[in-house]
Amino acid sequence: WAAYCTGSLPIGACVVDAQGNILSRGRNRIMENQAEVPYACGNTLAHAELNALLAFKADRQVRRAASLYTTTEPCPLCLGAFYMSSIRTLHYAAREPFAGSTNLLGTTPYLSRKPIKVYGPADAELEILITALAVEFERSDGVFHTSSVLQSWQQAIPAGVELGEQL
């Protein structure tokens, strides 16, 4: 929500330990001009997952026991950062049928060597709400900026697109 309120895409992420304690947080900061260190902001690389991972400082043993939670299925950039982070577990609340890239895991020798666990949407209503908020954000100036994105969302999560168009 904080990302949305600052004019960025409404995506957030956090890293938690094995007991569920939050160790770091990040949000999309693409449209923000300032952020405290270590967060990225003001460019197309300032994604929520990347910011949560940049803020996560821990040794390898703690990293391997941690989990990354994120609003939407990570894009190629964020999936790569997650993979490089040594965190072994990923949870996301909504599919991202246009840019989501968890399907890349296991497709190359490099992306096959770590035992990664991925957990996708567990709550269909939450996925609809997340998609609706993303649609509303993209249409906030009256125009959906990428029709292929909307098309992919419409095919995968039609109720979310319909709700987002009503907001």
Identify the function of each model-found stretch.
Residues W1-T6, S85-L167:
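Zinc-dependent deaminase
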Residues I11-G20:
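Short beta-strand scaffold segments in enzyme catalytic cores
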Residues N21-M31:
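Short beta->alpha transition motifs characteristic of CBS
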Residues I22-S24, H47-Q61:
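Glycine/small-residue-rich phosphate/adenosyl-binding loop
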Residues R29-A46:
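A short, polar/charged loop-to-alpha-helix boundary motif
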Residues Q61-T72:
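Immediate flanking context of iron-sulfur cluster ligation sites
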Residues T70-R88:
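Local cysteine-cluster metal-coordination motifs and their immediate loop/turn environment
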